[in-house]
Amino acid sequence: MAEVVFRDLAEHQGLGAHIVSTSAGTSEWHVGERADIRTIEALDRRGYDGSRHRAKPFTAASFTENDLVVALDRTHERILRQWAPDEDQEGKVTLLLAFDRAAENLDVPDPYYADTATFDSVLAMIETASRGLFRQLEPALRSSLGQRAQRRTTPSQYSSPQN
């Protein structure tokens, strides 16, 4: 859910081409499979397309391939921190609900053994926290993109004077 929500948010803010949102599990259960149909249905009810998602495992390369590693609960956060090859990589690991100021708990519940309403509730949590995460990342990202655009235009701004 979080991958789909965050990607959609980035696209709607005009930054989809500059942000890569992926999802990976800490176990190899369901590798290659689609998301649970109840997840896809919950996403669909809120206007998201979760049909392209396929489960894949988090690997050692995942740390170097990503600037941020977002865990949905403290158990996964602990596992990811243990897997980090060094302190810099460990520092990339954070909890999604840490970006929701109103969250009473830092763990996103696993709705797998629950009813449809729980899937919808979990999705609402993910949406709120994803907006908080995006608000935190957006200024630095836009600034970085602006600096790149400025560097591309700088040479023409400083052309030599004509005599």
Language-model segments: residues:
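Short polar/charged helix/loop
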Residues: 1-163
